[in-house]
Amino acid sequence: QARAWWSPSGAGLWMSTLLRPKCDRSIWGGIALVAGAATRRALTALGADEIELRWPNDLYARSRKLGGILAESKDQSAGAWISLGIGINIDLKNEELREKAPDGLSDRIICLREVSPAAESDPGKIALAIIEELRPLYGQFQQGEKLGDILGGDLSVAGREVLVERPGKPVLRGTATGIG
């Protein structure tokens, strides 16, 4: 879905890393969830609380969006790769949100400072913590471990109503029990 990410200059962390997975390409779609789990764990280790990883690639706190993960893959003559992008709102000023945010957005986003004022807010330290958390999870992912085992309790989908939308087919509704 062509959605835009908005955050004022200097108010967050936006990072990208290039991955060259050796695992079967059919499972590459799970890498955004793996990165989301790593990001959630890193933020929690740095003092943030109330952080939820929501399907398929969003980080929420207090029912508002804190950040997101984007994974795009490419096949080229030099090999296949995934560009993994992570964005986190760290310090958004309320007046800046009201003045500059696109219509209706200021009520739907939140920043790390608002959620956990004492949490680490240095973008460099947060980026390093994310990479340190991602490294072992990415290794498990490449070794073919089940996504549900890698994520553990990081994904906040269990017990929630979910919809499955398929082109040209009826929408399926159900209650999520986890991820396989």
Where are these regions (language model features)?
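Long, positively charged amphipathic alpha-helical accessory segments at protein N-termini or as interdomain linkers
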Residues: 23, 29, 33-50, 61-180
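General beta-strand structural signal in soluble alpha/beta enzymes
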Residues: 51-55
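DPxDG-like acidic metal-binding loop motif
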Residues: 2-23, 31-35
